[in-house]
Amino acid sequence: MNQSSAKGSGGRRSLWSQARELSQLAPPERNRWVDFLRALSILAVVFGHWLVAAPYIDEAGAVQGGHLLGILPWSQWLTWGFQVMPIFFLVGGYSNGVSWSARLRKAEPGQKGVYRDWFASRVQRLITPVFPVLLLWAALAFAMTMAGMDRDNVKMATQLALVPVWFLAVYLLVTAITPLSLKLWKKFGWLSFLGLVLGAWAIDYLTLLQNVPYVNFANFLFVWVGIHQLGYAWQDGRIGGGVAVMLLAVGLAALVWLTVFGPYPIAMIGVPGAEITNSMPPTIALLALGVTQTGLVLTLEPWGRKLLDNLALWTATVLMNGMIMTVYLWHLTAFVLVMVLAWLAGGIGLEMYPGTAEWWWTRPIWIAVYILALLPMIAVFARAERVFGPIRGGRTVPKLRVVLGVLAICIGLAMTAAISIASPEGLTGVRLWVVALPFVGAALMGFGPVYVWFKREPAEAA
């Protein structure tokens, strides 16, 4: 959706009035359900994280990093509703298919660098909001280390706050192969999806039954590209009412068979102490959940699109999509801030053991506090989703630089989530190479995060 810089008195308009104006400019052919599902999926993940993370103070007065799914096994069923990253990848397939097809239509015959420019622009819009949170936590990790804090605690706080960046590394790789995956869909249709399902099943077979090490990481592509492929089917009009209901039924049956009667855990995210995780790396069970959720949300699509004809609801959707990556990237920072303040205040609210009646009744209060802590972060950092610097002054970025750049970004983000930017040794207490990789990747791809942040006039945003 297009948005431009507010000038003069327009700069003083409320965010709601700006979103309302943008919502009224949306073309009538736009599928508003896509935007709604994008916002819904991220918000579900945010509230799921706030609910699952359950630190408390034990009888000895020590803070324990409680995990609700480990404390209350029945709560693992809740992840079937809160683990909605598959919906984000479904929406990503729809959006990337539309965007890439439009870019091809606009390209002149024989024009070079079409893919490189398209992909560099997509990367820039996704990675720019990461830079502020990454820099802040690098500075905090350094400051906490210099203050003499236990390095394990520094690592725990830093890793908890930054773990959401894992999905960006995967999503960038999935987006990178959009031209290939879309071409496969156009040529083979549903067979292109079935091939990925069989590939995910084969990886799980090698992992669980043959004990082949490391091969399970291939499912980051098989599973997520498979769900991304369903987005093409949706955009192509191949998932109508009957097909959507069939996907819902088949996906749910497979999910129950794999988890209730099969070897896979009920939880769709990692549970402390569990031998198998459905998300890191993903399994065929998570793919079954993705098919189930696809069938559900597309069965509801006609009702949802009619509902979004309501201007207030559509404006709220536009407003949320304008800050959605900021909400996602900063929500655990807000959580850590609240926990630290509660601890400094004598452990107020942390004396309740997770899962008790008292703990459940106080969840709405805690979530309200998390939202209040998040609001200033949105106010300061959401602009990173709306301002973009030029990519090499409009010149095409060389192919090798694009490849090296995206690899550096993805490796940096993956390491941030996997091993943390906090270092157990060294003078600074920070893994500087991990922090630097996304910035190096951005520079290689031709856009500078510092320039972007201080740029006053927002460029056109998708």
Cite the ranges covered by each PLM segment.
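Alpha-helical transmembrane segments and their immediate juxtamembrane cytosolic regions
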Residues: 2, 7-462
